[in-house]
Swiss-Prot record:
Belongs to the fibrillar collagen family. It is found in: Secreted; Secreted, Extracellular space; Secreted, Extracellular space, Extracellular matrix. This is Collagen alpha-2(I) chain. Residues 627-636, 866-877 have a biased composition (Basic and acidic residues). Trimers of one alpha 2(I) and two alpha 1(I) chains. Interacts (via C-terminus) with TMEM131 (via PapD-L domain); the interaction is direct and is involved in assembly and TRAPPIII ER-to-Golgi transport complex-dependent secretion of collagen. These protein fragments were extracted from an ancient tibia bone collected in Haiti. The modification 5-hydroxylysine is found at residue 88. Residues 1-979 are annotated as: Disordered. Keywords: Extinct organism protein, Extracellular matrix, Glycoprotein, Hydroxylation, Secreted. Prolines at the third position of the tripeptide repeating unit (G-X-Y) are hydroxylated in some or all of the chains. It comes from Neocnus dousman (Slow ground sloth). It holds the Pfam family Collagen. The lineage of its organism: Eukaryota, Metazoa, Chordata, Craniata, Vertebrata. Type I collagen is a member of group I collagen (fibrillar forming collagen).
Amino acid sequence: SGGFDFSFLPQPPQEKAGVGLGPGPMGLMGPRGPPGASGAPGPQGFGARGPAGPPGKAGEDGRPGERGVVGPQGARGFPGTPGLPGFKGIGLDGLKGQPGAPGVKGEPGAPGENGTGARGLPGERGRVGAPGPAGARGSDGSVGPVGPAGPIGSAGPPGFPGAPGPKGEGPVGNTGPSGPAGPRGEQGLPGVSGPVGPPGNPGANGLTGKGAAGLPGVAGAPGLPGPRGIPGPVGASGATGARGLVGEPGPAGSKGESGGKGEPGSAGPQGPPGSSGEEGKRGPNGEAGSTGPTGPPGLRGGPGSRGLPGADGRAGVIGPAGRGASGPAGVRGPSGDTGRPGEPGLMGARGLPGSPGNVGPAGKEGPVGLPGIDGRPGPIGPAGRGEAGNIGFPGPKGPAGDPGKKGHAGLAGNRGAPGPDGNNGAQGPPGLQGVQGGKGEQGPAGPPGFQGLPGPAGTTGEVGKPGERGIPGEFGLPGPAGPRGERGPPGESGAVGPSGAIGSRGPSGPPGPDGNKGEPGVVGAPGTAGPAGSGGPGERGAAGIPGGKGEKGETGLRGEVGTTGRDGARGAPGAVGAPGPAGEAGAAGPAGPAGPRGSPGERGEVGPAGPNGFAGPAGAAGQPGAKGERGTKGPKGENGIVGPTGPVGSAGPAGPNGPAGPAGSRGDGGPPGVTGFPGAAGRTGPPGPSGITGPPGPPGAAGKEGLRGPRGDQGPVGRTGETGAGGPPGFTGEKGPSGEPGTAGPPGTAGPQGLLGAPGILGLPGSRGERGLPGVAGAVGEPGPLGIGPPGARGPSGGDGLPGHKGERGYAGNAGPVGAAGAPGPHGSVGPAGKHGNRGEPGPVGSVGPVGALGPRGPSGPQGIRGDKGEPGDKGPRGLPGLKGHNGLQGLPGLAGQHGDQGSPGPVGPAGPRGPAGPSGPPGKDGRTGHPGAVGPAGIRGSQGSQGPSGPGPPGPPGPPGASGGGYDFGYEGDFYRA
């Protein structure tokens, strides 16, 4: 577990293992995981030693304890320098350090390059009504007047998704006017989309209601979609209103004549069921209900372009893919047959408008899959092109795009307790293991060893199935999710090695390749949504002190890539993000044959610009190539004010964005060219590789020197130094008292001179005292050899002399040569001992006499002056090596390196399957008018529609007559604005 490494403190000698204070906090970490259990400290582990105690008596050197098993722990700091093992003594154990503060939570990796819109907060879930059976398509009726849009209800609680009713397959009729949009309910959980049927002719876009999406009501029978206008610039998103309850669906339009029955599309695959809810049974395909009378048409919005796809935020729960209540429908333009959608590619130039024809019936919608667990939703895949409905509430979602790759993980911090966030998407394969740092040397106070390799990770379990979806917490504004990666295969688990010191975290590996997409599961009946889990996101742990940057570990071996995991359950679609940037236009489909020329509709009122994106060709009838006549409903002259939509039929589908509302009233539009399908948005490329991990920070400060190791064995004794110079001789001992002088005998005659004795050893000079009487002679030295000669006659003894007065003692003279000994006189009697004289000054040193016999050892003299230092003796043999010192304390971890720069975005991946159309973005600013496209072939003249009631807007100025017949393919140069 993270902590500060106090290894730089001085350590007391220890007999026991030091108390380990764990390694310091790492650098910025990802969210703090629950701390691993600490292993029991082994004897003499790496713990920091406390402050040194007083040195104990040197005991035996303790041997360093074994290393304790290190429990899994946060990243370790560098091992400190090993200290020398202290003598075994009684130092106190160091205080246990407090655990370091948890590391700062790492910043999340940069989001994948998703669209940029921020996601609104999803409202509460509304209850989803069960979709009723789809009515049969009505025949083309005249468009009734547009009813006013119903007020947006407040969001109801989310319901469980009903099972989708079967899609009716009546012939395609002309679209009846849509009823007014019910208030928008909350989005229910998304169902799995069925296969996308061939695109219908695009209907005019309804006005976008602001507000949360209502739960889809039961859909009335869809009218034929009118041609899709060229998207106007995307307006800024309106604020998300509260989700409305689902309004009652408007009455269905009257039943149109039957078109030929299209083949029903096969049901789309169901995504794997999420863990929540039991699957309900799929309802039988209902009979197509008859369509009710058409509600009044909504104001005609200019067809909006697809909004830019927003980045996915956290997905709100999307309701079942029932058709939502349509927003008030704009006046329908003539429908062109749509060509079948090509593979979505990049959007090419727009194709010439197809001729309006009947739309084949849409295939059945696939059953709604159970909502998957809410992973982080991947970006919405490119939409399959469904029948374009009026752009009102989103219709059923197309199949989900591939999940984007999971963004790179930030550095893992200590994980906080996981909040009730949804499960993460599948984890990419583990990044390469960081290199194991070299093990620091142990030695006395070596520099800190490099950090050991992380032991092989424990076996990675299979990625668990996503847990049940918790109740979504309040959604924060989700950041844009990176595209969801498919789950990488779990790496093989290595055996768990002993934990080395944990190396710094290696840079995250690149995201693993997307796993294969799992096979669609059997279509389950829609389950009921599980109860929402409670709990908001966990608290962010306190930021730890950033540890020093660890040395960069060596690159670990890359684990084997595990097998691709199954796709996780499909997450509930995220809340609709703000429209992302528009994808590049796909190549236009071939122009369909011109449809019969529809009769010019009345000039609808110019609705407020729908969420249409650019009011491109359908946009402002800026240049209304509109047929003037077609103006409001003039005869279908050239297309009505399709201003810029010259190409869109004569009637620009929308009058100038200006007064004419984004769509001028649609004259009889020549059929607007079918908008080429928007190319699928390319997949967001995988997130660029993580930035390079910044250079490792400087190594942490070296730990302080460890304790001194035990004393090595004593080396052999060196040779004795040379003897120092002798100290001065000790003082001479005091003389004994002199005997009393005997009476002198008469002097004998001098005998012949004896041989000179060897000079006696000089006595030490005595201190100069007063001269005493001469003492008795000291002991006789060994007699010299006898002088030869006959003994002289003994002289008479002299009389006693008077004692001399005590003179000062002179310095001792140098000893004169010894005279020849006189013949010994008779021994006088021993006189009384004289008084002890004071010590005389030392006489000068006489020459050295022969060595006398060893006398008894005198008392030790005072210590002599220290002699000069002798020469060093030879070096003794090397002592035994000392015991190995303890490991030094672990150094603090280095500071975390700076985050590397974000890697450049990876190459754009292949386009994924087209996702469902995103919700229309808010109306963008008007784009610049594009250049007129080439004139398409003339469409067949459509039947004249009856004039709708005048819309509330002022009529647009009549456009100049457009070319008659064919719509122009309108090239589109409008700038895309990011919403």
